[in-house]
């Protein structure tokens, strides 16, 4: 079980999701950052500077961050139960 959980953590740390042609890191720390930004931005079209998975900087909207967060969460959920199956 320990090995399976370790592998799961490794897979989660490598999650990358794509929204509007931009690739976002989707690991747990990145998901936390996305969630904080989504809460802090007041308007769906308000933008924030974001470092993408390839280390380029982009202006992203609240809507784009919400989509990236959802996709990353879905990817993590798909991975998370594997050690117990």
Predicted regions: what they are:
Residues 1-85:
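A preference for well-ordered globular domain cores
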């Amino acid at each position: 079980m320990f090995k399976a959980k370790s592998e799961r953590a490794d897979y989660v740390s490598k999650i990358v999701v794509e929204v509007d042609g931009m690739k976002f890191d989707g690991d747990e720390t990145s998901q936390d950052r996305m969630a904080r930004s989504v809460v802090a931005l007041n308007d769906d079209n308000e933008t924030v500077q974001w470092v993408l998975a390839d280390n380029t900087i982009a202006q992203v909207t609240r809507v784009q961050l919400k989509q990236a967060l959802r996709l990353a969460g879905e990817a993590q959920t798909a991975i998370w139960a594997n050690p117990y199956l």
